Amino acid sequence: EIYTLSLHDALPILASLLTNVSDNSILLGYNSYIRSSHLMSAGYTKAIGERGTWALGAQMLDYGKMDETDEQGSVVGSFSAKDLNFQTSYSYMLSDYWSGAITAKVLLSNYANYSSTALGADLALNYFDEAHGFSFSAVGRNLGGQVKSLYDDGVKESMPFDLAFGLSTDFANAPLRVSLTADDVTHWDDVKFIQHFVLGMDILPSSNTWVALGYNFRRAHEMKVADKSNWAGFSIGAGLNVKKFKVGVAYGNYHVAASSFLINAGFSL
């Protein structure tokens, strides 16, 4: 449950599942990203009546310090770069099987002496049949655009709108769940067909533990070196639930020289 809250910032498909998150929950997350980049997040959820759930979240992606150079490439100083995301989500159970969600977000970027502001929204719809362990989701991501341009000419850009779909199913006789996500559907012809998909598998040895494996076909293709993938595109994670406290860790390989480590901790008040 707590991982739905932590992941819905990166995968808005999961925002429609917030109705399954524990009431009055707090989550903190940290992700050591490529090289000196770091992603930090915090979130809170609260049940609204019998069918609604409200969530509030914030994320900061800090790219660290970088060398500032002149036209000849000589280092003349350093600068930092950050992205901030503040968002609120509301999820509602439309029926026993269907739920929907909307997320509104404010995005702030600061790169050296340049800054920008954008307003955006995500829409999500989920069908979940608990008796058969089947789920289907659809999302429209990044509706909106800049209200303050990053550039001196004042040109404002739209956010990169995207459609994504996902489905998952449990196995009646095995502690497994498999999932398939189709991403970047609005740019279907930009890459090969298979590169739009992400495969996932959850291993559920008990009600309090889980292990997850994932494979991103596009990342594996784009990050391979000399026709060798070096495990690019693979990710692995695990989690433990102990009463009101939940913790999860994950590792993803982006490139032979770049990987990512994520840790979440959540507590139900």
What are these regions (language model features)?
Residues 6-269:
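Subset of outer-membrane beta-barrel
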Residues 1-5:
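Short, exposed "boundary/linker" segments that immediately precede the start
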